[in-house]
Structure formats: C-alpha cells, structure tokens
Regions:
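Acidic, Gly/Pro-rich loop/turn segments at junctions of secondary structure
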Residues: 1-10, 14, 61-62, 79-82
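A late-sequence structural motif
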Residues: 73-117, 125
Length: 126
C-alpha cells in the first residue's frame, strides 16, 4: 500500500461515488497521494492509464474487457475497503410497471451473492 502512495493517480472527479469510495479507503494516505488527473468518465481514466500516465481506481466490471485484452492489470489491495453499495430509487407516487418490476428482479438476481462487480454475469442480447 505504501508503494501506491508514490504513484501518479488518475481518479474520478471530486463528488463522484467512485471517488468517495476511494478517498474513504485511502483516508490515511490522502495527503501523500500524487493525483495527476481528475476525470469525469471511466473510459477516459482507462485510456489515460493504458497510455501510461498513471494508475487508477475504477470498477472491475468497467475494466473487464481491458483485463481480457491484457491492456490493464488489477493491483490487488485486500487491505483497502473498496466496497460500494448501489440502490434502486423511484418516485413514491409513480406506478411501477411490470417491465420495471421485471428489470429490478433481473438486477437483483444477477447480483445475488456477488462480492465484486466483475463476478456479475451479464446476459447476452440477441
């Protein structure tokens, strides 16, 4: 972990959920981090890291193809808590259609028991 604090970091912008999770996990090291770039899009972070500008912290699901191609590799950090929760929200007075209920059920079934985003198996669209 100490080695990571000396690297050039490419991160999401302040206020994004990913950045909040990262900042909380690295809270004891924030003063010593070298943040080279703050970008608003995950794809931009991937491209910057692939170009050798630094290291980043984004969802494994977003990186699945880059890992498969071998253009990026994961740095395992079991000592960091990088878990992030997502919630479904909707207007309390809006009617939920069958399609919305089916979509929510599908999302719950795809993520049941999943510990990391790259463990989600997305169905192919024919």
């Amino acid at each position: 972990l100490e080695e990571l604090t000396h690297e050039a970091w490419i991160l999401r912008e302040q206020g994004s959920g990913t950045r909040l999770t990262f900042d909380q996990a690295m809270r004891h090291h924030l003063n010593s981090l070298n943040v080279r770039l703050e970008l608003e899009h995950t794809e931009a972070i991937k491209r910057a890291v692939e170009s050798g500008l630094g290291i980043g912290c984004i969802s494994r699901l977003a990186l699945r193809d880059a890992f498969r191609r071998g253009s990026l590799v994961a740095v395992e950090t079991p000592e960091l808590d990088l878990v992030r929760q997502f919630y479904f929200i909707w207007h309390k007075q809006k009617y939920q259609t069958n399609a919305i209920r089916e979509f929510l059920d599908l999302c719950r079934s795809l993520t049941a028991g999943v510990r990391r985003s790259d463990e989600i198996v997305l169905p192919s669209i024919a």
